[in-house]
Amino acid sequence: MDRTTFGRKTFNTQRNRLDRFVAPRDSFSETRRRRSWHAACDVQPINNDIWFGKNLKKKKYTKYLDKALDLESPDKSNSIKRMVQPWPCIPRKKTYLSSADSILDLPTYSYAIFPELLDWSNDNVLVAALGRNYHKWSWRSQSLISQGYAEYQIQCCKFDPRGELLLLGTYMKTVEIHNNVKSKKIDSNTCNCLEKDNRNCSITAVDWSPTGNSFATGCSWGAVTSFTRAAKLISWRHFVREAILLILIALSPNARYLAVTAVNTALVLLLTWPSLEMYSSIDSDWTIRTISWHPWRSALLGVGAVTDDLQARIALWDAPTCKVRDTSIGPKRYRLDAMLFSHRTGELVLSMWNSDRAILHPKACSQLVVMSDPDTMVDQWGEGRSGLDRVRTMVFSPDGTKLATATSDEDLIIWNFLPEDKKMKKTKCRFFSALPEYLDEAMQGYSLR
């Protein structure tokens, strides 16, 4: 069967029914389908999961009764600890992740070694890089609008903040800059690993500065480079003296710091931008999975990790003061895949999966979790036998109301993260003001009573 990038998909694709008296699964509502999978999940440890939908409703109702009856909550013992908000946030009052807006196809994405192959520009265009080609899909027209290609296989991609350029990190140490309108290469440069260390590398991570006047790259040999907007070299530093599979980099919102780490390592570096001088570092006994800057603070870095006993942890690192606060997230046996702060609400979005549940089902049964603090989950989706596979990367739409996730099952799912903005209504209507103005002119300012 021929598959096209950004082709329409459904969660429950199946062959046509031969028996016309048996209703297809798609005819049932999503809520009913999610309630019907109890047979394989009656195992006691899984049903006792505190993130299980039934237990979440009980917890929410308990809090409601405590507030209505003016009872003291058991959590009040830790009230002093929780008075300090770990990260700035305006949490939602309703849940919105119960439905997906669109489900599109990403052929061959499951074979990609590096996951950062998806981005969303400020002019509402999604890009997916697969192999040497990249494909652009317009949110407004809901269709594929253009395609482009790179000289080598693409490992990562990123739109500039202005939406004019597309940055591509590729194999053979090359970074390319493409014009977003024409989908053609206009500039390129290479990493200095070959000249300095006589090694060929791959560009595995890229990120733009907040102004779009410069960008950073990270390679598979642990080198970090800063470039101008025209791909001119600014600085180059080598921090890891061994081959690493995936390096992660992220520029702070105030454009002063560059966070650098490698997946499945324990060290996070903080460099000055754009000189790439060492500023600070943290070393722990965790396994680093992802990093993300909070968009509402000048330099508050979130570090997502997993401990040896499979406990997900989040460390919040305030770069100017070098203070680090870490806390556990959720129950044990949950592993962290991706993490992102919402620029609209400040909420923390996590993609996690339960290793125990993954043993029972062919899919890892990922959960998208939206948290306002380490102890409060305000929204979630993803329980069931046929649901969300592991999310490898995710990006927000420009207005922050949609969340696009790319899964190991080669699905691009666009979620309704928040309700769309209502159109501004005119507070003054010309139809009602025209008659009084005409009468005032006709009567030359006199008022007849």
From Swiss-Prot:
WD repeats lie at residues 108-148, 149-188, 198-237, 283-327, 345-382, 386-425. PROSITE patterns: WD_REPEATS_1, WD_REPEATS_2, WD_REPEATS_REGION. A motif (D-box) lies at residues 386-397. Keywords: Cytoplasm, Repeat, WD repeat. It is found in: Cytoplasm. One of its GO terms (cellular component) is anaphase-promoting complex. It comes from the Eukaryota. GO terms for biological process: anaphase-promoting complex-dependent catabolic process; positive regulation of anaphase-promoting complex-dependent catabolic process. GO terms for molecular function: anaphase-promoting complex binding; ubiquitin ligase activator activity. Controls wing pigmentation patterning by regulating scale cell development, thereby playing a key role in mimicry and crypsis. Probably acts as an activator of the anaphase promoting complex/cyclosome (APC/C) that promotes the ubiquitin ligase activity and substrate specificity of the APC/C. Belongs to the WD repeat CORT family. This is Protein cortex. It comes from Heliconius erato (Crimson patched longwing butterfly). The gene is cort.
